[in-house]
Amino acid sequence: MENLLQQLISLDQSLLLSLNGSQSLYWDEVMSLITTTWISIPLFIALIYAIAHSSTPRYFLATVLAIGLVILVCDQVASGICKPLFQRLRPTHDPAIMHLVDIVDGYRGGRYGFISSHASNTFGLCVFLSRLFRHRGLTLMLILWASLSTYSRIYLGVHYPGDILYGALVGILSGYLLHRLLLWAGRRWNLFPPHRTASFRCTPSGYRVADVKMVIITLLLTYASILVWAALGIGR
């Protein structure tokens, strides 16, 4: 058992070193931007608008509360339980590997990294919102958003791939269960929005397709802005 654990740790370290960093200042800047929370603010604003536009006030409040619970549960499981429990050092703090890790602008993150809060939060929201809107295009964009956000943590050297994998699994389970809770609450207290008329094209769950497309465009424009911003930021 101890042998197997050591093999898994060695594999995790090898994967990290093969995926971490690059020789490009441009991609250093791109990943430094993608990893920040504030870069997703336009996406969250667009999502809130899309939810509000197709919901009754009660259902809107219930949905926002459920989204808040996704973030709270994922963050507390990752940072409040797993990190202090397992105390696995981040690659940037691990004496066995820290001198081999490519870091950007001196950023090393906190002391412990298992499991990744970024992974649990982003994949939790990805699953919850995908099941909420039930629109294939938005689901693909949310998977891209969660994947890029979590890969940026490996690129910057602050998480092992294993931290990301288990964080994502916690997020996926949390997002799924909390969406089921929202559905139960909607049926229990009759919170669902009224049936949409044929005058609007809607997703199977009742959200306007035009609003969903607006969310997708917002995310695409955010990534386009990151690419331009990173190009302008080279050499700073």
Predicted ranges, named:
Residues 42-51, 68-72, 214-230:
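Hydrophobic core of alpha-helical transmembrane segments in multi-pass integral membrane proteins
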Residues 48-52, 74, 78-87, 130, ...:
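Membrane-water interface at transmembrane helix exits
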Residues 34-51, 65, 118-121, 141:
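Hydrophobic alpha-helical transmembrane segments
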Residues 48-77, 139:
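Interfacial segments of alpha-helical transmembrane regions
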Residues 65, 69-74, 78, 166-174, ...:
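Hydrophobic faces of alpha-helical transmembrane segments in multi-pass integral membrane proteins
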